[in-house]
Amino acid sequence: MNLIGCDFSSSPSKRKPIVVAVGHASAGRVQLQSLLRFDTLDAFADWLKQPQAWVGGFDLPFGLPRELVEHLQWPTDWLPCMQHYAGLTRAEIRDTFKAFCDARPVGGKFAHRATDTPAGSSPSMKWVNPPVAYMLHAGVPLLMAAGVTLPRLQVADPSRVALEAYPGLLARELIGNTSYKSDDKAKQTPERLIARKQLLQVLELGQTRLGLRLKLTHAQHDTLVDDASGDSLDAVLCMVQAAWAQAQHAAGDAYYGLPACDPLEGWIVSAPLPSA
């Protein structure tokens, strides 16, 4: 059983491809095996469909906020909602979501999922900074078409299990709000390089609440540190979250550590339950 972590892009290119970390776990140690890069959505879709066994963490939202869906009178079951959403253009998504936000007061423009606060994630309806609404629009249909299982959302091939991951959740636990990446070359500073080294050091020591130690070769360590965009490191963070989920499943949790949650919205793997 492989573990995968995916740093996704809704518009991949040779300059900024989709990055997939592949590894495996044993006795609390997570070993990185390889980093794969896909510069088109079609190439990534073909890889997803290959007959292989994996548990994966994908850095893209798997659902929309119920408040938004109900306001728009879209289907409130996950599958028909995603099918409806996939049929829209990006321009239609932007215009629809902008109109929703424009009608709401400052400080409450966006609707949120229940998982957003404990995970510290952006609302899945954001179309800019970051454009996670487009990531959902591009990525979830690929997972659906590939016939993978999405725990608490879609039951399909049990040998390929996809979970919504968020590298920022784990990164903040390890180094706080220190920035460790940037796509802007002018912001790819020595301070961010040091932060990537610190993040990897804590991962390799296993000093996280997930109880896992990352194992890297020297070459792999250098690759992750040298990628100033942080995409390779984010893929590895997602892989570690997938390893935690796999461990929960091995211990008897049929839902890979995901709590009972809104079956329209989904949940980010390893995000804590909100305080009562």
Region annotations inferred by a language model:
Residues M1-I4, F8-A276:
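RNase H-like (RuvC/DEDD) metal-dependent nuclease/polynucleotide-processing core
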